[in-house]
Regions:
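Residue-identity detector for glycine
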Residues: 15, 21, 31-33
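Conserved short alpha-helical segments that host acidic/polar catalytic motifs at enzyme active sites
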Residues: 38-266
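Serine residues within intrinsically disordered or low-complexity segments
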Residues: 6, 13-14, 18, 42
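Intrinsic-disorder-associated, low-complexity terminal segments enriched in Asp/Asn/His/Tyr and depleted
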Residues: 9-10, 19, 25-28
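Short, Lys/Arg-enriched N-terminal segments with co-localized hydrophobic residues
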Residues: 25-43
Length: 266
């Protein structure tokens, strides 16, 4: 099942182009913390992703991965936002089993190296999703026997001084009768490009109706403040249309550009 919603590009406006793609895809056949002498289970509260997005005018690019509430689907979502005409002049198009970005109006394309890439690629029964061309890095390294984490050791944050935008990535990998997923962020050391901080978060056998959300920025600003902490726990519903529509409607109307959602039968 696929659905695309587009808003016509208006050259007299700020250049906002919105596009939303949705498809259903069949796969090819807590921490425990110590506090003094007391052991306590660290419980991350589940946030309302819709309220989270509504309260943040500019989360940048974001990835959601999890399991549908009925336990039948692995779910992933990816969105992009933009403030400049160049960043807003993009749509998602299908590319094999994945997607790639493309300039809506090629005549307005300025610097493609950070905005034109494949956010989603499928390698066998694994699905990769990222906010940049590290999708290809992960694909190529894993094709040659390396792991998700090993492949990302060859990359770092983006070179968009002074923001040094984090590279965020995720992967869904099947296991016996289910799946695992991982998320990664590569970021500067509080805005200092002399150090790259690499974090990987792995989730084995996710629970029904639960997922995690990671994005590039804490909000708007100059420079843009990088995401902090670990991916946020969120609820994942059963209905792809409901999930897509509410995500899209929760993103800031002036800054949202494109959204892609996929439910994978498990």
């Amino acid at each position: 099942m696929a659905k695309v919603i587009s808003r016509p590009y208006n050259p007299k406006s700020s250049g906002l182009q919105s596009h939303m793609g949705v498809c259903r895809h069949k796969r090819n056949k807590v921490g425990i913390g110590l506090l003094l002498q007391l052991k306590r289970r660290s419980i991350m509260k589940k946030i309302d992703i819709y309220e989270e997005l509504k309260s943040n005018d500019y989360p940048g690019r974001g990835i959601v991965i999890g399991k549908s509430a009925d336990g039948k689907s692995a779910v992933k979502a990816y969105f992009i936002m933009g403030r400049s005409v160049n960043s807003r002049n993009r749509v998602f198009i299908e590319d094999g089993d994945g997607i790639r970005t493309q300039a809506f109006d090629p005549s307005k394309l300025e610097d493609p190296h950070l905005i034109i890439y494949a956010p989603v690629r499928v390698l066998g029964d694994k699905t990769i999703v990222t906010n940049g061309d590290q999708t290809d890095t992960i694909y190529e390294h894993m094709e040659n026997g390396q792991t998700f984490e090993q492949s990302l050791r060859t990359r770092e944050f983006e070179d968009d001084d002074p923001n040094f935008t984090p590279r965020i990535s995720g992967i869904i990998e099947p296991n016996k009768g289910g799946f695992d997923y991982s998320m990664s962020i590569l970021k500067s050391a509080d805005g200092n490009p002399q150090s790259c901080q690499r974090y990987t978060f792995s989730y084995n056998n996710p629970l029904d109706g639960e997922g995690h959300f990671i994005h590039t920025y804490m909000g708007d600003g100059s420079p843009l403040p990088s995401f902090e902490g670990e991916p946020k726990k969120v609820a994942i519903p059963n209905d792809i249309n409901e999930f897509t529509d509410v995500l899209w409607n929760s993103l800031n109307a002036d800054n949202k550009v494109s959204l892609f959602v996929r439910f994978i039968d498990i």
